[in-house]
């Protein structure tokens, strides 16, 4: 391993300047005042199985991507293509782990690059014609005065045929490169020209593929470093990326360059929630059903809901009972009022009857009532003073000495019975006759006089 690393390092000493083909910056804080860098401020695993992962968190800076079972596909389909993405966020020290499979093809370079605005850089690079090794490299502030930084390390298996996890773990004290679970390289701060060339400012994450063996865009040295000229009749050449787990070791919303030194101590962390972190939270929060929302509520909240629901039911029951009892009370009051009205009407009728009785009006006779009691009521006295004695009480009948008349001569006539053939009146010794007839009269002229 040491032999291979040293041999490849010797070659890289000459060729490494051309490795920077995909590195660039839009504003260099060492030379001008630049906008603050938007922070990631958290950790997240970006799974490249849909375009939304790229569009939400990355910019496609060259070419285009497709997506399949093996993740995002960075494909060179013809000469001059170099599909590349760059994160919309920065990390200020952190860890980046990419699960990927490098592209095949002589001269084709697959890369994982961390790059800052002042051209601090940490690299993983894979050459399509090399199926045994991967290159590690770094730069500080774009310094290319020496080319002794790249070191190649063997991979557990062919990096163009198998997926591996390639990791960069970066702090203010050192940089580590890992393949799967094996640490292959460590760069200490002091080992980079006492920190002057040590990568130490906020960085974006860049993933891409390009043709170092394209003679139209590269020098002969770059072509040799890439393993030779690319044969574009053998396209497509594809790098596959399943995921990138990124952790920002700083927390904040932005990173501010306070001077032009490029020293990590001059970077100010602006507090707050980053835009990217808020987007992650929004996108990763699942839409829950009502049942799931209920299941996720704390027990105290559920208890409060139960109590509130019970109170609501109790209130409804109370309202129902109140309405029922009030209506029942109203019905009882109405019934009592009706009964009082009927009782009053009866009392008024009785009062009127008694007034008529006292006045002897309407057939009432106080003298008759005194001797006969209630039998004097009910119509008996209604004939008094009228001269009417019924159909059998005509003058001719009285003159002919009919039994009815004869009976009437000895006492009052029965209102229902007519005596015939000498039958006796129902009045007997048990029912004494009145001492004075209720009325008397003569057939002469049909007038009635007392006997």
UniProtKB/Swiss-Prot annotation:
Q: How does it sit in the membrane?
A: Single-pass membrane protein
Instruction: Tell me the first and last residues of the signal peptide.
Output: 1-21
Instruction: Tell me the GO BP annotations in alphabetical order.
Output: carbohydrate metabolic process; fungal-type cell wall organization
Cited CDD domains: GH16_fungal_CRH1_transglycosylase, TM_EGFR-like
Task: Spell out the InterPro entries in the cross-references.
Answer: ConA-like_dom_sf (IPR013320), GH16 (IPR000757), Glycosyl_Hydrlase_16 (IPR050546)
Q: Which residues cross the membrane?
A: 305-325
What is its subcellular localisation? Membrane
Q: Which UniProt keywords apply?
A: Cell wall biogenesis/degradation, Disulfide bond, Glycoprotein, Glycosidase, Glycosyltransferase, Hydrolase, Membrane, Signal, Transferase, Transmembrane, Transmembrane helix
Query: Which Gene Ontology cellular component terms are annotated?
Result: fungal-type cell wall; membrane
Record's catalysed reaction(s) = Random endo-hydrolysis of N-acetyl-beta-D-glucosaminide (1->4)-beta-linkages in chitin and chitodextrins
Classification via PROSITE patterns: GH16_2
Which residues carry out catalysis?
A: 121 (nucleophile), 125 (proton donor)
Q: Locate the residues binding chitin.
A: 125, 206, 210, 222
Q: Which residues are glycosylated?
A: 31, 43, 49, 59, 130, 143, 165, 273, 366
* Domain GH16: residue ranges: 22-241
What are this entry's molecular-function GO terms? glycosyltransferase activity; hydrolase activity, hydrolyzing O-glycosyl compounds
EC number(s) reported in the record: 3.2.1.14, 2.4.-.-
One short Pfam name that applies is Glyco_hydro_16
Q: List the disulfide bonds.
A: 27-34
Q: How does it assemble?
A: Forms homodimers as well as heterodimers with other crh protein members crh1 and crh3. Dimerization may be necessary for the transglycosylation activity.
Q: Which family does it belong to?
A: Belongs to the glycosyl hydrolase 16 family. CRH1 subfamily.
PANTHER family, per the entry: GLYCOSIDASE-RELATED, GLYCOSYL HYDROLASE-RELATED
> Which function does this protein serve?
Dual chitinase/transglycosylase that plays a role in cell wall architecture. Chitinase and transglycosylase activities are coupled. Required for the polysaccharide cross-linking at the septa and the cell wall. More specifically, transfers chitin to 1,6-beta-glucan in the cell wall.
Q: What is this protein called?
A: Crh-like protein 2
Q: Native species of this protein? A: Botryotinia fuckeliana (strain B05.10) (Noble rot fungus)
């Amino acid at each position: 391993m040491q032999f291979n690393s040293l041999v490849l390092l010797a070659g890289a000493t000459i060729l490494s300047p051309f490795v920077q083909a995909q590195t660039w910056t839009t504003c260099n804080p060492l030379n001008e005042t630049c906008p603050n860098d938007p922070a990631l401020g958290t950790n997240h695993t970006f799974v490249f199985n849909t375009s939304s992962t790229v569009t939400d968190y990355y910019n496609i800076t060259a070419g285009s991507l497709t997506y399949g079972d093996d993740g995002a596909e960075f494909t060179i389909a013809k000469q001059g293509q170099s599909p590349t993405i760059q994160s919309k966020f920065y990390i200020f020290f952190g860890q980046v782990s990419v699960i990927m499979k490098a592209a095949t093809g002589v001269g084709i370079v697959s890369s994982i690059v961390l790059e800052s605005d002042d051209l601090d850089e940490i690299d993983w690079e894979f050459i399509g014609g090399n199926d045994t090794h991967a290159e590690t490299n770094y730069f500080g502030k774009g310094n290319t005065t020496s080319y002794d930084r790249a070191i190649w390390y063997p991979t557990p298996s062919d990096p163009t045929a198998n997926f591996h996890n390639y990791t960069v773990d970066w702090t203010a004290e050192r940089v580590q490169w890992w393949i799967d679970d094996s640490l292959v390289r460590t760069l200490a701060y002091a080992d980079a020209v006492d920190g002057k060339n040590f990568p130490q400012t906020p960085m974006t994450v860049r993933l891409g593929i390009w043709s170092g063996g394209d003679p139209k865009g590269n020098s002969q040295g770059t072509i040799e470093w890439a393993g030779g000229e690319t044969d574009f009749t053998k396209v497509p050449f594809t790098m596959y990326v399943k995921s990138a787990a990124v952790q920002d070791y700083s927390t904040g919303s932005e990173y501010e360059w306070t001077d032009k030194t490029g020293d990590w101590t001059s970077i100010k962390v602006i507090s707050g929630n980053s835009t990217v972190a808020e987007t992650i939270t929004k996108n990763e929060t699942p839409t829950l059903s009502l049942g799931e929302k209920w299941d996720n509520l704390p027990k105290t909240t559920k208890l409060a809901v139960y109590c509130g629901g019970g109170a609501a039911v109790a209130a409804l029951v109370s309202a129902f009972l109140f309405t029922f009892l009030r209506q029942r009370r109203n019905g009882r009051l109405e019934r009592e009022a009706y009964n009082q009205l009927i009782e009053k009407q009866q009392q008024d009728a009785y009062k009127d009857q008694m007034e008529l009785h006292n006045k002897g009006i309407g057939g009432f006779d106080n003298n008759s009532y005194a001797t006969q009691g209630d039998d004097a009521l009910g119509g008996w006295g209604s004939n008094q003073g009228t001269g009417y004695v019924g159909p059998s009480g005509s003058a001719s009948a009285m003159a002919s000495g009919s039994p009815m008349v004869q009976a009437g001569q000895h006492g009052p006539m029965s209102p229902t019975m007519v005596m015939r053939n000498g039958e006796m009146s129902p009045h007997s010794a048990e029912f004494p006759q009145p001492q004075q007839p209720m009325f008397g009269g003569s057939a002469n002229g049909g007038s009635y006089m007392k006997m």
